């Protein structure tokens, strides 16, 4: 299995699919799946290409979810080998997308293909949802496919997202949930004027200072057994014209919260509004909800992937919910159990992104064993 996984991973990496471009990656995947009897459905939205492939017609529906798009390479001269050459050096496969996530995508595909070859009349349904819009806006990718499936009353029972979850060793971490993410774009109004005549102006920076102190020190919750406490970080602040003698007319503050299941986005919005009113600030605010928190509690999916990892690697994974958002948040809207597992994440989005060839082979074996655990038991 390892050779097939690595070969497919190299084919995908060699295509410079900077988000939201697919550069033919999904066509390669679809051709292989179609030969095995998978039903292929293309779902393009604007400049994003999405693939929904299925084998089988009954429940449970097990979906592998991944993306073919990658982030930009940065200065290619800093790479030890060209970022889209997919070179293997001392057992390590280098290239943009090697770890995030063309390597695990290849492993999921090969695992599904090998299972179907051996079990053409398997029970349940094996599906793959692949998008080219995960790394950027994520507006025309998985979420649009999910919306389409929900309008057709299609279901996903179990979902494996191939994001690179491992920390120090393959299989040491699986993600069984993610925190929600909400961003506030806050504009606080003042009155512009000359710094020498402050009584004729109103400095929004000075007015906002007590509010910012409260906003950044407020304890939203203490977390729970599955999630760390909700956290807030200010990402951007801007005011003024660049001149040292002009009191600014407006202060812009952008902040983001990664929140757990102890609060909701509505609670967050309400509390921020209360703080702003308390400090008598004139403002307007625009909210952007990237995703709500989701959690897959211990059950058949988590048991199946844990058992598979233990058998292949000898490691018992730790289930965690930290880190950023993923497309798993969209699948969770369908009521599915969602787990993320993939190779080491230490090199993702970096120069010389890479993945161990041995780890890729084991990823394929783990995904395959997970299918066996879910469908053959």
Swiss-Prot record:
Keywords, sorted A to Z: Amino-acid biosynthesis, Cobalt, Diaminopimelate biosynthesis, Hydrolase, Lysine biosynthesis, Metal-binding, Zinc
Cofactor note: Binds 2 Zn(2+) or Co(2+) ions per subunit.
Positions of the catalytic residues: 69, 134 (proton acceptor)
PROSITE patterns: ARGE_DAPE_CPG2_1
EC number, UniProt record: 3.5.1.18
Pfam families referenced in this protein's UniProt entry, alphabetically: M20_dimer (PF07687), Peptidase_M20 (PF01546)
Residues annotated as binding Zn(2+) 1: 67, 100, 163
Keyword flag Acetylation: no
Domain of life: Bacteria
Catalytic activity, as annotated: N-succinyl-(2S,6S)-2,6-diaminopimelate + H2O = (2S,6S)-2,6-diaminopimelate + succinate
Alphabetized InterPro entries for the sequence: ArgE/DapE_CS, Bact_exopeptidase_dim_dom, DapE_proteobac, Peptidase_M20, Peptidase_M20_dimer, Peptidase_M20A
Gene3D superfamilies: 3.30.70.360, Zn peptidases
Annotated TM spans: none
Binding site for Zn(2+) 2: 100, 135, 349
Co-factor requirement: Zn(2+); Co(2+)
Protein family: Belongs to the peptidase M20A family. DapE subfamily.
Subunit structure, interactors included: Homodimer.
Known function: Catalyzes the hydrolysis of N-succinyl-L,L-diaminopimelic acid (SDAP), forming succinate and LL-2,6-diaminopimelate (DAP), an intermediate involved in the bacterial biosynthesis of lysine and meso-diaminopimelic acid, an essential component of bacterial cell walls.
Record-linked HAMAP family: DapE
Name of the protein in question: Succinyl-diaminopimelate desuccinylase
Organism encoding this protein: Haemophilus influenzae (strain PittEE)
The organism's taxonomic lineage, starting at the top: Bacteria, Pseudomonadati, Pseudomonadota, Gammaproteobacteria, Pasteurellales
Encoding gene per record: dapE
């Amino acid at each position: 299995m390892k050779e097939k996984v690595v070969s497919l991973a190299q084919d995908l990496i060699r295509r410079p699919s900077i988000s939201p471009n697919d550069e033919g990656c999904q066509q390669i995947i679809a051709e292989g799946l179609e030969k095995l009897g998978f039903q292929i459905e293309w779902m393009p939205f604007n400049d994003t290409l999405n693939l929904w492939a299925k084998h089988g017609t009954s429940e449970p529906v097990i979906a592998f979810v991944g993306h073919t798009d990658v982030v930009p390479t940065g200065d290619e001269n800093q790479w030890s080998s060209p970022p889209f050459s997919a070179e293997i050096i001392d057992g390590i496969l280098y290239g943009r997308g090697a770890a995030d996530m063309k390597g695990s995508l290849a492993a999921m595909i090969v695992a599904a293909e090998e299972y179907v070859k051996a079990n053409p009349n398997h029970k349940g349904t094996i599906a793959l949802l692949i998008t080219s819009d995960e790394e950027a806006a994520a507006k025309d990718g998985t979420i649009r496919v999910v919306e389409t499936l929900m309008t057709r009353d299609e279901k996903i029972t179990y979902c494996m997202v191939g994001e690179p979850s491992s920390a120090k060793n393959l299989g040491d971490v699986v993600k069984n949930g993610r925190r929600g993410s909400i961003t506030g774009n806050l504009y606080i109004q003042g009155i512009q004027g000359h710094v020498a005549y402050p009584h004729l102006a109103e400095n929004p920076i000075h007015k906002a200072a007590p509010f910012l102190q409260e906003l950044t020190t407020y304890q939203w919750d203490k977390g729970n057994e599955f999630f760390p406490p909700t956290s807030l970080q200010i990402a951007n602040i801007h005011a003024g014209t660049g001149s040292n003698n002009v009191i600014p007319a407006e202060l812009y503050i952008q902040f983001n919260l990664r929140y757990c299941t102890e609060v909701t986005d509505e609670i967050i919005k309400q509390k921020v509004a209360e703080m702003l009113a308390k400090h008598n600030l004139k403002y307007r605010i625009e909210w952007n909800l990237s995703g709500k928190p989701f959690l897959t509690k211990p059950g058949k999916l988590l048991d199946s992937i844990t058992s598979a990892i233990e058998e292949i690697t000898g490691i018992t994974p730790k289930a965690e919910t930290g880190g950023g958002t993923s497309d798993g948040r969209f699948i969770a809207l369908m009521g599915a159990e969602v787990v993320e597992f993939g190779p080491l994440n230490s090199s993702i989005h970096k120069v010389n992104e890479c993945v161990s060839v041995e780890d890729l082979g084991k990823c394929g074996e783990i995904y395959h064993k997970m299918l066996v655990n879910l469908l053959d038991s």
